[in-house]
Design a protein with these regions (language model features):
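Asp-based phosphoryl-transfer active-site loop
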Residues: 2-17
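Active-site phosphate-binding/coordination module
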Residues: 18-120
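Residue-level signal for inorganic ion chemistry
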Residues: 32, 43, 67, 147, ...
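Short active-site oxyanion
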Residues: 36-40, 60-61, 146, 206-207, ...
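Short, structured coil segments at secondary-structure junctions
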Residues: 57-59, 66-67, 166-169, 223-224, ...
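Conserved acidic, metal-coordinating active-site core of Asp-based
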Residues: 95, 99-211, 215-223, 232
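Asp-based, Mg2+/Mn2+-dependent phosphohydrolase catalytic module
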Residues: 223, 230-264
């Protein structure tokens, strides 16, 4: 198959465990772009946190960020923004606060939290973005792009079930990492964003490749003509993927691009 569009997750997929892009992956991506294949990111990261990696690779396609809630070019042109309704966001935060979990809110591509908890400090060090503080939800005045809840995996799994039961289809709930539970606009998913991007470029579904590692990648892996799970992906994602490559630290992304795009 001649793949014309590749969407790649960042954390635990393209990025190594030290949060860098390997030289081999860099070469493979740039070679595929030179061949005429379009490449973008599909990440839960903030736009400003994903942007340095896009600039490093010279990507000129819209970047799918915030799990699909914000799609924006590296030069700043916005394709669309689907934030969480302010009243729903406040209701979610009030629902979650009694559980004592860390909460992040994202407004205008800025990170807000109430306190510099250990979870908050760790997140900020990974994202490499400034932290702003506000009382949540009282000081929340604008629709947030998403809400992120951080805590122990089992607690988040139980909370997700309760949120789903209470809010039904008013929100999208996804687990992006073991300790990250993300709440966003119901249509803000990587799969929806990738589908809209492919259609805007007149690229057929079977000509799309998507590469990821966790359950927030599930709908884009299902949508793509070739859904790839890296070797360190969760088992549920591996089970539905068309291809399972090596792990993020063993150049799984580079391997699949070399074998399925560059050699095609």
């Amino acid at each position: 198959m001649d793949y014309k569009l590749i969407a790649i997750d960042l954390d635990d997929t393209l990025l190594k465990n030290d949060l860098t892009i390997s030289e081999r992956a860099r070469r493979a991506i740039k070679a595929s772009i030179s061949k005429g294949t379009l490449v973008t990111f599909a990440t839960g990261r903030m736009y400003r946190s994903a942007l340095p990696y896009a600039l490093e690779l010279g990507l000129d396609l819209p970047l799918i960020t915030y799990q699909g809630a914000l799609v924006k070019y590296a030069d700043g042109r916005e394709v669309y923004h689907r934030p969480l309704d302010l009243n729903i966001a406040k209701e979610v935060i009030n629902f979650v606060k009694p559980f004592g979990l860390h909460i992040n809110a994202y407004i205008d591509d800025e990170l807000y939290m109430e306190d510099a908890t250990d979870w908050g400090k760790k997140y900020a060090s990974i994202a490499k973005v400034p932290v702003h503080f506000m009382q949540l939800p009282r000081e929340l005045k604008n629709d947030p792009t998403k809400i992120l809840i951080i805590g122990e995996s089992e607690e988040l799994d139980q909370l997700a079930l309760k949120l789903q039961k209470y809010f039904l289809e008013a929100i999208n709930i996804t687990k992006s990492k073991e300790h990250f539970l993300e709440i966003s606009h119901p249509r803000a998913t990587k799969g929806n964003a990738l589908k809209e991007l492919a259609e805007s470029l007149n690229i057929k579904r079977e000509q799309v490749m998507a590469i990821g590692d966790n359950m927030n990648d599930l709908d884009m892996i299902k949508y793509a003509g070739c859904g790839v799970a890296v070797g360190n992906a969760v088992e549920d994602l591996k089970n539905i993927a068309d291809v399972v490559s090596k792990s993020n630290d063993d150049d799984g992304v580079a391997e699949v691009i070399e074998n399925m795009v560059l050699k095609a």
